[in-house]
């Protein structure tokens, strides 16, 4: 499929270019942008715009898509107990997940940048390694970490093995509210810290040594140099990394579905959408929740693209 796709695109552009070459120069300049950008816009419209419009249309109808109900599904999306719980949990994911991922990424990148090059490479490889694991795969790994067995039984879960080894009682970590949501967030922090570390590390290496030395000569200690020179200098990168992780946490689904199925107070927006559409078979409500999630993601995505564009222009 890759060969056919790439080959087809090359053939399309080659033939289109041959056709455009037959026109006068003035027409060439007008037609070339449409020739090269047009197919991409058409594909995006077919696979993105049309499904969005169909989803919005479906959100205005009842569960079976037969009776027009107007904004009733949206009222449910903003007032039902399940959705209010989902909004609360998504906000927790957004604040804690993003804060810890970027914070740990910045900390590790800063410490590794000061270490021996060989040690730096090894540490970065180990921290980045979880990024190669799928969300479901990571969930399976962490299920063994949080595994619970009744008191007296052999604890195969790492966390409970440590707790019982220290004389404590085993806990059903994924059932304890509201801490279970934080235990799920820990999985994404484990996954996203590597991404944040790599991007921030590249930005740190771009900080001019002369700037750091000037700060030290002026009497600034290392903490002052870091917070008053380094952090402001890489602010754009920190914002870009943060918004990228925010997008990820807003759409979080795999971890929650794999670990708890949204039960025990861990429901999130994307999982509630899945529940309504594929368990309750209420396509109207599911579509409305999908639209709400899309509206929540668009401003962050737009801001992220603006930041990326500014950084590109700076170079």
Predicted regions and their residues:
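Transmembrane alpha-helices
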Residues: 1-26
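A structural signal for multi-pass alpha-helical bundles of membrane permease subunits
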Residues: 32-315
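Short, Lys/Arg-rich N-terminal segment immediately upstream of the first membrane anchor
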Residues: 23-27, 228-231
């Amino acid at each position: 499929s890759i060969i056919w796709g790439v080959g087809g695109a090359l053939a399309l552009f080659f033939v289109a270019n041959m056709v455009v070459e037959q026109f006068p120069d003035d027409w060439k300049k007008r037609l070339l942008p449409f020739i090269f950008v047009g197919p991409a816009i058409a594909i995006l419209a077919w696979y993105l715009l049309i499904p969005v419009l169909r989803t919005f249309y479906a959100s205005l109808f009842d569960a079976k898509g037969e009776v027009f109900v107007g904004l009733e599904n949206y009222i449910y999306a903003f007032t039902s107990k399940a959705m209010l719980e989902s909004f609360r949990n998504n906000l927790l994911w957004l604040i804690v997940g993003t804060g810890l991922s970027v914070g740990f990424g910045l900390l590790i990148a800063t410490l590794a940048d000061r270490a021996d090059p060989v040690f730096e490479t090894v540490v970065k490889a180990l921290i980045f390694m979880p990024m190669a694991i799928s969300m479901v795969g990571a969930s399976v790994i962490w299920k063994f970490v949080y595994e619970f067995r009744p008191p007296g039984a052999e604890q195969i879960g790492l966390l409970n093995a440590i707790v019982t080894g220290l004389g404590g009682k085993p806990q059903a970590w994924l059932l304890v509210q509201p801490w279970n949501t934080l235990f799920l967030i820990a999985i994404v922090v484990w996954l996203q810290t590597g991404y944040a570390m790599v991007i921030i590390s590249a930005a740190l290496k771009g900080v001019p040594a002369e700037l750091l030395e000037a700060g030290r000569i002026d009497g600034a200690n290392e903490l002052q140099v870091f917070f008053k020179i380094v952090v402001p200098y890489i602010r754009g990168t920190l914002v870009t990394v943060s918004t990228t992780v925010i997008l990820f946490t807003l759409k979080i689904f795999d971890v929650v579905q794999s670990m708890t199925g949204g039960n025990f107070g861990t429901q999130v927006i994307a999982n509630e959408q899945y529940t309504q559409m594929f368990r309750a078979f209420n396509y109207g409500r599911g579509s409305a929740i999908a639209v709400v999630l899309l509206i929540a993601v668009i401003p962050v995505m737009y801001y992220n693209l603006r930041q990326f564009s500014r950084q590109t222009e700076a170079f």
